[in-house]
Amino acid sequence: MNIPNSIIKEKLKNVYFIWGRGKTTIANRLKDEYCFYIYGTDESRNRQMNLANPVDQPYMCRDYYKEYGVKTFWELPKEVIAEREKHFVEEMTPMMIAELIQLSTLHKVIICEGDIDYYAVAPVATNIVHLTNQSTTFDWFDRPDHENIRDIVAKRTDLSDEEKQRIIDHAYECVTPDESSGTDWVAELGLKNIIWNDHTSIDMTTTDVADYFGFVKQVKNDY
């Protein structure tokens, strides 16, 4: 069954997508200020994996740990991590969109933050903003919703200190984007891009996002 984009877009008109770096921080701040419902795609992964089947979601069903003989995700080769994430997100996106359509009937405003198939969602979404975080202190692993790679590796008793450091360095290499072309796709899709850095506070960026979405013109806590 192929559902026209216009129908999906109408169903998602009260869903506001925040993409890029710092999206979780800004989404949580909007929740604090407006009591919005937050849909985190990272939090939905396990739920979607339980629904996946090898025919329709082969990448979601693959046992990469067994295939490559590793104990943690970040021990996989960098190219395997990139390929796995690309296809995993592509397969998971229709499942998340189905959930968002259902949730859109229960909430006046939904903030959807997290990784999703941007090219698939852009044509069916009315509200999207992309964040470019240029802060020199940004650490992908140093946040409450991400497992701290240093803590995880430090607890391993089967590795030497040198092996532990190699895994840590490899993990950071895998999550470090290519800044030279990091926002090319944002411009290609015609998305609003908001830059924040060491001179921009979380409050300022939250206000920029809220203003772009038109939230500041509405009554708080009425969602």
Give names to the regions the model predicted:
Residues 112-154:
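ATP-dependent NMP and nucleoside kinases share a basic, alpha-helical "lid"
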Residues 24:
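Walker A/P-loop
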Residues 46-108, 115-116:
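ATP-dependent small-molecule kinase phosphotransfer cores
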Residues 2-9:
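Pre-Walker A adenine-sensing motif
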Residues 14-17:
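Short hydrophobic/aromatic beta-strand immediately N-terminal to the Walker A/P-loop
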Residues 146-212, 216-223:
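Small-molecule kinase domains that catalyze NTP-dependent phosphoryl transfer to phosphate-bearing small molecules
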Residues 32-42:
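Post-Walker A helix-loop "phosphate-sensing" segment adjacent to the P-loop in P-loop NTPases
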